[in-house]
């Protein structure tokens, strides 16, 4: 008869961002433990709150399944001595399996007889196996851990309770400094310690103590309560998904409520108000039916609605203090001059090994000018890029950004517009931070995109030049994100800027503040980001083939990878790649100084292939270019079928290799076809 298992780990308050991943990890690790220990089950349900992680297994088998395993030992000639007795090798083998030589039998494998033993292991009762389940808890990994009391061990947070129930039976286990039982803790303020009656009564037992153990249920409660407030008040609430996920992991018993603030604060830019409410206070933003910000907010209390009016007043008071700061900085910052702030950036350190922010901006300005030409920007756009590059970090010295650093760039745009700067310049100041996260929004204007590229390129080159290069998962200066941003921007705007030539030109620049170094490392780092951009959709061989192409143009490389992936599912892919691979491999033996001489052609196939290569224009999309190259496959095969490339005559051999070299020089702009796998 199957049983239900409950494991609950009661902890001190967990950081909100840790709760959901830890809940998932616990379920996965327990499932692995049960599977590895041959305990079948029907379902696993996980639970979490800020003060507990729990999992319930339904339909757990009473005992392990029996195990029968065959083990192969030494060959018969080694297992028996000259007298036909079992040798020490055979005896040691069976002893290692917990058996005797009586269990030995011989089986033939590919004409050779070997020792085999069969071991039968009866399944243990589930209760006995579960005595080792604390290894699941010990194996849990967390982004941070801590010591407490005088203990030598560490964990995400101090552990207060451990409950392990098999149906209604409490298992006796020890974990860290805690002995298991059936007592759990209720809500910190509304509940008390409570006894968990059985695995099945878990949610009900905690609910009686104002704890909703199921995170999905808490989320549904929050959303439903907010929707009710929307209807009652005739408003719209921005239910931001990230904020919702954070809030549900801050509360055990959610109660949503609406508060308000004075309408005068609506004169402050919306971004300031939203940042104050959402990022600093974890409040949901409220709008009218037209989408305009209202002087209200929605928050979620960790508790019931008892004395809710006092809670609302307290939350309003805290928010008003934030809004007062925002209003003050908004008013005072407008008294500042952009030129004065830019001048002060000489005293702001970009990095102690690299120099000041002003020096970083100077280098960025030079790079931006070069990129503007490469991207064929208009004269007006070039002017806007140059002006933006001169001032784009000024808002870092404003009071608003000093208080709300999330608003860097955003306030720069607003203050620039108030100061009379061109709209394109102001917008570029905001957009140069983009993308600010993996998959985040990209700049929408060419001016902003060029400034973003220039800023990220100098950041990348500067940190690499002083040896601050990411290693493993360590990337304290977010250089991977910056470089991924470079790749995404180039692809989004379709700018066919050869990265190798661009980086070469940047390394030729001379700055008093810094000399760029470690160019090879920079190029490999950029290639790695292009590789990541190709993603899982492109197999490793296709990614490597594209990365070894002769043209390091990001949009073309990504398009080539996509075209090759699609082509790999067609019937002509294998023969085309095989013929091209043969050509690529032979061309490696070519003398680069030798040009094709038609007078040395000895057959029509040489002439036909050479002419086809000369006529190969590689126009159109990546898919069309690939189709043009693949179309040469029959001509290449005909050439190989009728021509001895590695002829004894040196002149003939060099000429034929030169034909193949011409083919490779064109085809390699798409990919190194000899890196592709056709097996």
Swiss-Prot record:
GO cellular component, one term: cytosol
Similarity field: Belongs to the class-II aminoacyl-tRNA synthetase family.
Record keyword Ubl conjugation present: no
Enzyme class: ligase
Annotated InterPro entries: Gly-tRNA-synth_bsu, Gly-tRNA-synth_heterodimer
Chief place of localization: cytoplasm
Protein name: Glycine--tRNA ligase beta subunit
Subunit structure: Tetramer of two alpha and two beta subunits.
Reactions catalysed according to its record: tRNA(Gly) + glycine + ATP = glycyl-tRNA(Gly) + AMP + diphosphate
Keywords: Aminoacyl-tRNA synthetase, ATP-binding, Cytoplasm, Ligase, Nucleotide-binding, Protein biosynthesis
Entries under PROSITE patterns matching the protein: AA_TRNA_LIGASE_II_GLYAB
Keyword Thylakoid: no
Localization: Cytoplasm
GO MF term list: ATP binding; glycine-tRNA ligase activity
Cited Pfam families: tRNA_synt_2f
